Curated annotation (Swiss-Prot):
It is a multi-pass membrane protein. This is Uncharacterized protein aq_1900. The keyword Membrane applies. It comes from Aquifex aeolicus (strain VF5). To A.aeolicus aq_1446. The chain crosses the membrane at residues 4-24, 94-114. Coiled coil: none annotated.
Amino acid sequence: MKRIIALLFFFLIAFGYSLSPEEEKQLIRDIAEIKATLKTFMEQTDKRFQDLNQRINELREDMNKRFEQVDKRFEQVDKRFEQINNELNRLIQIMVGIFAGQIALVAAVIGFAWWDRRTIIRKSKEETFEEMEKELRPEKFKKLLNALREKAKTDKELEAILKKYGLL
């Protein structure tokens, strides 16, 4: 553009002094033609720049829309992660509850078995002592000792044992 203006200026200076009236008219027509061409060129250039600016603005708007869509998608993904995290926490709480229940059940069974064992052993001891008392009454013991003494009369080995313990 500067070149065209400089060229036009050069022609005006160079031919301004020695032109005839007809050449001058021709020069003015040429200059007018150049101006018209230049004006057309400028208008076309302006239109191209406007079109380019419009395309850039459209691309920018499209990019902004896409970024908004991506942001919305990230928000959805974040919400989904929160939901999954909440579900996992709930599942962990349920599992801890089940585990604690099982531990309590095992502790109750062990406690019951220990209590039952002590009760049964105590009853067994009492029953055993009662049976022993029934079986080892003094009169039965005397009868047993008399029977052993009778047998010791015929059995020398038994006689030695009873003497050793002072029962003969």
